[in-house]
């Protein structure tokens, strides 16, 4: 298996049609309530059941700018599928995520990709800061309503976290590029290498005639634990590790910025980013141990990611938490001292709080990837005058996704602090509906 090859191969048409038959087409479909972008789930599934796959894809695109992406990376088991009526009958939920991916992939491979209808141009310019899922979703909905949409991206590639954060074995870049290409065909303009707040200010954008601005700049600032030894060589954030491997070909020693390829790698964390990091390290030939302070039951990662990580031979060391790192005389990390943890009473997240037992163990390692969450990059919010900020430099918004400055809306991780692709897309959709209402009234 190659390093970039996608692990989940998707459904065949026969399997998809058989699975679609299981959908009971409920009169009150609770699955739709579980979807942050309100996809008409029974409608697209019944189209698949009839063999009308292109119509199914059309239904998906009415509400989702990125169906092939969501079919791959959404935590369906916590959203739409968790509301499926079959669960009440002690049966497995309809595989909504697999079916969404099937319809989107089928349409792409058929060569008959339909574009959603676009309203006549209204001549109003809007700017989007960041080209991740929130920005792309917002851009798609605004261009459909006839707005002149410009997306400004700080990196050299469009796609935000879909490109730099999620490895290709889970979400191939070419899939993301097709979705971006569709937005281009609909009329969205993209500009890379533009840091709003540095390259160009919000005031300058407004002087260029932009009437509304949506900030979807994400959470690119990695969290660390603040323990001794985190500054040793080869201790890095998952953010840096994945960005370099995914976007900058850093696994290739011939590149300008090669990464240290560890033989014994420790990944700290229990979310999807931790799974992506350990599965990436495994593909680079490492012996990988995942260290997580709670038990496996409390891991926030998608069940499918945990299953794949285990199948690929990742060692799980739960109820352990790094206390400090050790290094050789050159300052390169060579080990980690771990606190052995036990679960206490539930905390505010509803999960049982991990507490130290007083016991420690030591592991050898030559690389550590820290995946304990991210915070919004303060650069964009701090560069906007009169903007109310929350904890950790998040942008404070109302229900309509409007900030304390009425012409500026925001969504995704810059508001939430660190969430999922689909929640960011839901924010982008809500912001688009409300900003369009404001600008057209």
Which residues are covered by each model-predicted region?
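Glycine-rich dinucleotide-binding loop and its adjacent helix/turn
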Residues: 103-120, 178-198, 222-284, 389-404
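A conserved FAD-binding loop/helix module that cradles the flavin
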Residues: 277, 414-441
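FAD-site-proximal beta/loop scaffold in flavoenzymes
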Residues: 231-262, 346-418
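Feature captures the FAD/FMN-dependent oxidoreductase FAD-binding
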Residues: 55, 120, 125-129, 177-227, ...
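Iron-sulfur cluster-binding cysteine motifs and their immediate structural context
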Residues: 25-50, 69-101, 154-157, 187-190
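Ferredoxin-type iron-sulfur electron-transfer modules in oxidoreductases and energy-metabolism complexes
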Residues: 2-20, 40-72, 90-118, 245-246, ...
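N-terminal Rossmann-like FAD-binding beta1-loop-alpha1 element of flavoenzymes
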Residues: 124-150, 274-282
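Rossmann-like dinucleotide-binding cores of NAD(P)H-dependent redox enzymes
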Residues: 148-151, 155-191, 278-324
């Amino acid at each position: 298996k190659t390093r970039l090859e996608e692990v989940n191969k998707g459904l065949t048409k026969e399997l998809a049609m058989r699975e679609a038959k299981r959908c009971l087409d409920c009169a009150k479909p609770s699955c739709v309530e579980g979807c942050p972008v309100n996809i008409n789930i029974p409608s697209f599934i019944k189209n698949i059941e009839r063999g009308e796959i292109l119509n199914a894809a059309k239904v998906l695109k009415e509400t989702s700018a990125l169906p092939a992406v969501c079919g791959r990376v959404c935590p369906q088991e916590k959203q739409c599928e968790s509301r499926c009526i079959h669960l009440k009958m002690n049966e497995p939920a309809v595989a909504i995520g697999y079916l969404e991916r099937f319809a989107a992939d089928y349409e792409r491979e058929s060569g008959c990709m339909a574009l959603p209808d676009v309203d006549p141009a209204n001549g109003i310019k809007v700017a989007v800061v960041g080209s991740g899922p929130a920005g792309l979703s917002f851009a798609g909905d605004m261009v459909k309503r006839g707005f002149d949409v410009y997306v400004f991206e700080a990196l050299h590639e469009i796609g935000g976290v879909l490109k730099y954060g999620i490895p290709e074995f889970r979400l191939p870049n070419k899939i993301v590029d097709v979705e971006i290409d569709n937005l281009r065909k609909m009329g969205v303009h993209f500009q890379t290498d533009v840091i709003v707040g540095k390259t160009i200010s919000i005031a300058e954008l407004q002087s260029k005639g932009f009437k509304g601005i949506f900030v979807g700049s994400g959470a690119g600032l990695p969290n660390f634990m603040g323990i001794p030894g985190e500054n040793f060589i080869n201790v890095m954030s998952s953010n840096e590790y994945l960005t370099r491997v995914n976007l900058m070909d850093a696994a290739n020693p011939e590149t300008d910025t090669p990464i240290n390829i560890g033989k014994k790698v420790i990944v700290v964390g229990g979310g999807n980013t931790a799974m992506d990091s350990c599965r990436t390290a495994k593909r680079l030939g490492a012996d990988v141990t995942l260290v997580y302070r709670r038990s496996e039951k409390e891991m926030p990662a998608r069940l499918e990611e945990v299953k794949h990580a285990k199948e690929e031979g990742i060692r799980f060391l739960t109820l352990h938490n790094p206390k400090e790192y050790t290094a050789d005389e050159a300052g390169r990390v060579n080990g980690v001292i771990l606190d052995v943890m036990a679960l206490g009473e539930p905390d505010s997240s509803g999960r049982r709080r991990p507490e130290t037992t007083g016991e420690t163990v030591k592991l050898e390692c030559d690389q550590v990837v820290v995946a304990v969450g991210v915070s919004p990059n303060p650069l964009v919010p701090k560069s906007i005058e009169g903007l109310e900020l929350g904890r950790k430099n998040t942008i404070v918004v109302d229900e309509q996704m409007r900030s304390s400055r009425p012409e500026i809306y925001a969504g995704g991780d810059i508001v939430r602090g660190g969430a999922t692709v689909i929640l960011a897309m839901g924010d982008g959709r809500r912001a688009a509906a409300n900003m369009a209402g404001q600008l057209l009234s």
